Amino acid sequence: IRRIAIVENIIYNNYLEKNENAPSLEEMEEFKECIPWICLKGLVWASENIYIKNKAKDEIKEIILDNPIDEYKETRRMKRHFYLHVGETNTGKTYSSIKRLMEAESGVYLAPLRLLALEIQDKLNSENIACSLLTGEEEDIITYAYHVSSTIEKLQLGTPYDVCVIDEAQMIADNQRGWAWTRAIIGVLAPEVHICMAPEALDIVIKLIKDCDDTYEVIRHKRDTELIVEDKKFNLERDVKKGDALVVFGKKKALAVSAQLLNNNIKTSIIYGSLPYSTRKKQFDRFLSGETEVIVCTDAIGMGVNLPIKRIVFLETRKYDGVSMRKLRVSEIKQIAGRAGRKGIYDKGYVATTKDIDLIRDALKAKPKKIEKCYVGIPESLINIDIDIIDALKTWSSMSLKGFYEKTDITRIIYLLNRLKKLDIDVSNEDIIKMATIPFEENNKTVFALWEEYCMMYSAGAVNLMKPTLKKNASAKKELDELESYYKSLDLNYSFGKNFNMMINNRFICSEKENTANKINELLLTNLLDHERVCIGCGKKLSWDYPSDRCRMCKIINDSKKERYDYRFRERRHADYRKNRRRRRY
């Protein structure tokens, strides 16, 4: 036992040298809960899992307020009135709110997407109302403007406005981004606040307003155009009509469908999530001008520009959500299908699908489940705590909240913080949290590598931020992906430089983004057939949803070759096994 104790002591002293925040042996002895665990699991385990976590909990309890609304003291001194615009998609909720925003001397529009923020900025500026833009990826600050169009995460809480418009408030239920809607509702400094939402969000928003001791009134918006679900299953080869929006879930599928239709002499506009705003706008304009008669899109069509779409067609009724393939939710079907039948252009809107007609029909009749919880983000006071930031966040996340509040999902943030830890990034807690919450696409390898490079540059004290470079000589099929990655890298270059006051070349970024967006649009016009699905064996054309990379004949031949190879491999293994047995015998 003595030897074990001596070795354990040596190991822990080495651990203390590497971890400054770890407790001394005397501190752990004073903490009675640690003693039985030291005997069972050892000093290091007891330090990390018992002492630090419990100490963190005690410190966090002291600094975190019981009610999230108390964080916004200046707002609590203001008397606010809320106008709650409730209705399904395409009912004019946002239109009514923006009208009021335009009448005010100063105001802010808070959007769920950069696309919507840009759209509203364009709208206000076209009406001679100077409006700035503020998003995670770009800014367009007009010095004399009293109106701001912003993504909701970029709301400047200390700035007072006459009118605030919060759009798509049902996203308060999103476990990663919902905190931004909660923060805006309880923290925005505006005496008049308009909130646009789907019906399922009404109850939770009212609870928040009552918790703030503010007043409200509900304005219900009804759909004027009837929405009809077609009984007949849709066939892509023969049923496409002018004014259709064909919905799939994935960029590759959208490109494959468009290529297949182009082969049938049907020109399309293409809309998907990673498409730059200016490219997307050009695709919209082609549809609006009649140059194309059909839109092929992902669920990105669910929010944004109201286009003259007569019929929404679900080419798929299942989507991959990052974990598994699942059926579309009621709220998703309503959001997308609601785009059919634009008010003032069509008297009726139509919805069709290639399969699962009952799923679509039932979803449109159903009432979505009411939202019962709203999410809160990481409190600012937590960032200044004298504990390892990862331990502090994990401990905070495990602590329960009172009432209808729920903590935001910090899985992504913890993952990025651990990556920074491996890179030995030595910056303040405030800066490291800023690094982990900066908007960028971590699933894109090129962009992720650039983010790591930028974090290391800042940590090393660099002043100038390295420009991203475009990978050249990419194949025709990969060129689109490379251009989109480059555009995202330019976004990251701008947002990182702005967040950390590093020197960036604004003129270069704007010029490169414009050129890249134009090149992407050109590729969608000229190289679309490169994305047509063909058999990798013989080159035969395949349908966009064909279940294999090979045509039927090539698959049969390939499978038989594989069977013969597997048979030979098994025979060879058996022969080697028998040979080795004979050798061992002698």
What are these regions, as identified by a protein language model?
Residues 106-120, 194-196, 239-264, 268-272, ...:
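Conserved strand-helix element at the start of the C-terminal RecA-like helicase core
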Residues 124-160:
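Inter-Walker segment of RecA-like/P-loop motor cores
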Residues 170-222:
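Post-DEXD/H (motif II) to motif III coupling segment of the RecA-like Helicase ATP-binding lobe
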